[in-house]
């Protein structure tokens, strides 16, 4: 299935208003016996998607390091002493070459990320050229550029952008414990601008930052209860980066991660639920459980911005073992 078929799946999603969820209801999902929760999530998944198809996206850092923000998990913050080297915005020809290589390896969506609080107008103009050139390859396009100013989302839409990623990261209650340089409401404002411009929203969170199960449930509720749920929901498993405040965070129970995938699938039945950062540390068996719980998208390629990802050969072998197809 190519990009046009992906669009057909999305456009075929029910247009009826999504139900409103409460934190107590999502906590009730988390509290179910794991096998019952996965069974329910798989049923919801099968009603809306091909259960044996996984969408593959590639993520490229087009501007690395030197970010002014203080996100406690991030290796690209200028406030922390990490191994990430600051790099300027990547030349257009290098971005296009990377997109072509990703397409040749089976990716249908190409995501471009830049480490800054938000794009300056002259930098945005260069990103617009990247979007146009990648779009011309027949790939879906996505960017993650931080917070947007008035009018910038419309420019991205005019360039042909399909998705804008801006994660909520965690719920409003826990947010101030991991980020202080901007607010949870700032992120919601950018999502509103993206939605108003007619761009598909990609927004999810990071699990394992020290938040409680209630915080995780509240994040899912916040996403599901947006005026329109995100079309794409990346779920990241924290990768502790040396030099960041979360470097020594204990690992999350893998089954809790599966529960989060399942709860997200049930609460957002027509969204693409993506396995994102942290997959390199997951066993094939854990990833298979996540697919069974409703994940149907993944990042494909050796790196996600600055963290590792399973190599392509491992992913291809996993798909063959599971009998699933890439789209």
From Swiss-Prot:
What catalytic reaction does the record list?
(4R,5S)-dethiobiotin + (sulfur carrier)-SH + 2 reduced [2Fe-2S]-[ferredoxin] + 2 S-adenosyl-L-methionine = (sulfur carrier)-H + biotin + 2 5'-deoxyadenosine + 2 L-methionine + 2 oxidized [2Fe-2S]-[ferredoxin]
Q: Which domain of life is it from?
A: Bacteria
Query: EC number(s) for this protein?
Result: 2.8.1.6
Q: Which GO terms describe its biological process?
A: biotin biosynthetic process
- Does Iron count among this protein's keywords? yes
Cofactor binding mode and count: Binds 1 [4Fe-4S] cluster. The cluster is coordinated with 3 cysteines and an exchangeable S-adenosyl-L-methionine. Binds 1 [2Fe-2S] cluster. The cluster is coordinated with 3 cysteines and 1 arginine.
What keywords would UniProt list here? 2Fe-2S, 4Fe-4S, Biotin biosynthesis, Iron, Iron-sulfur, Metal-binding, S-adenosyl-L-methionine, Transferase
**Pfam family of this protein, just one?**
BATS
Which residues bind [2Fe-2S] cluster per the record? 111, 142, 202, 274
| Molecular function GO labels | 2 iron, 2 sulfur cluster binding; 4 iron, 4 sulfur cluster binding; biotin synthase activity; iron ion binding
Pathway participation: Cofactor biosynthesis; biotin biosynthesis; biotin from 7,8-diaminononanoate: step 2/2
Q: Does the keyword S-adenosyl-L-methionine apply?
A: yes
Q: Where does [4Fe-4S] cluster bind?
A: 67, 71, 74
Cofactor needs = [4Fe-4S] cluster; [2Fe-2S] cluster
Q: Where is the Radical SAM core domain?
A: 52-279
User: What is known about what this protein does?
Assistant: Catalyzes the conversion of dethiobiotin (DTB) to biotin by the insertion of a sulfur atom into dethiobiotin via a radical-based mechanism.
* Recorded family membership: Belongs to the radical SAM superfamily. Biotin synthase family.
Spell out the subunit comment.
Homodimer.
Task: Output the NCBIfam families linked to this UniProt entry.
Answer: bioB
The protein's name: Biotin synthase
Q: Which organism is it from?
A: Dechloromonas aromatica (strain RCB)
Gene this protein is translated from: bioB
């Amino acid at each position: 299935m190519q990009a046009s078929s992906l669009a057909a799946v999305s456009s075929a999603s029910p247009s009826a208003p999504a139900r409103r969820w409460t934190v107590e209801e999502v906590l009730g999902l988390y509290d179910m016996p794991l096998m019952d929760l996965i069974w329910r999530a798989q049923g919801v998944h099968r009603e809306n998607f091909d259960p044996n198809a996984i969408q593959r996206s590639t993520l490229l850092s087009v501007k690395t390091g030197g970010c002014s923000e203080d996100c406690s998990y991030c290796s690209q913050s200028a406030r922390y002493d990490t191994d990430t080297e600051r790099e300027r915005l990547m030349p257009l020809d290098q971005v296009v070459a990377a997109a072509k290589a990703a397409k040749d390896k089976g990716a249908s969506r190409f995501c471009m990320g830049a480490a800054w609080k938000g794009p300056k107008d002259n930098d945005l103009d260069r990103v617009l050229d990247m979007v146009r050139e990648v779009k011309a390859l027949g790939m879906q396009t996505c960017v993650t550029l931080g917070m947007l100013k008035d009018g910038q989302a419309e420019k991205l839409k005019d360039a042909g952008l399909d998705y804008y990623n801006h994660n909520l990261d965690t719920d409003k209650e826990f947010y101030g414990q991991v980020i202080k340089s901007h607010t949870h409401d700032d992120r919601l404002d950018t999502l509103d601008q993206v939605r108003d411009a007619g761009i598909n929203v990609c927004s999810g969170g990071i699990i394992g930052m020290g938040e409680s199960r209630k915080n995780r449930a509240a994040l899912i509720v916040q996403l599901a209860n947006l005026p329109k749920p995100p079309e794409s929901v990346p779920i990241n498993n924290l990768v502790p980066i040396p030099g960041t405040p979360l470097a020594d965070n204990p690992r999350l129970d893998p089954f809790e991660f599966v529960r989060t995938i399942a709860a997200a699938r049930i609460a957002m039945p027509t969204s693409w639920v993506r396995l994102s950062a942290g997959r390199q540390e997951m066993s094939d068996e854990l990833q298979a459980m996540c697919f069974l719980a409703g994940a149907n998208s993944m990042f494909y390629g050796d790196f996600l911005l600055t963290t590792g990802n399973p190599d392509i050969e491992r992913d291809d072998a996993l798909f063959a073992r599971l009998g699933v197809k890439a789209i």
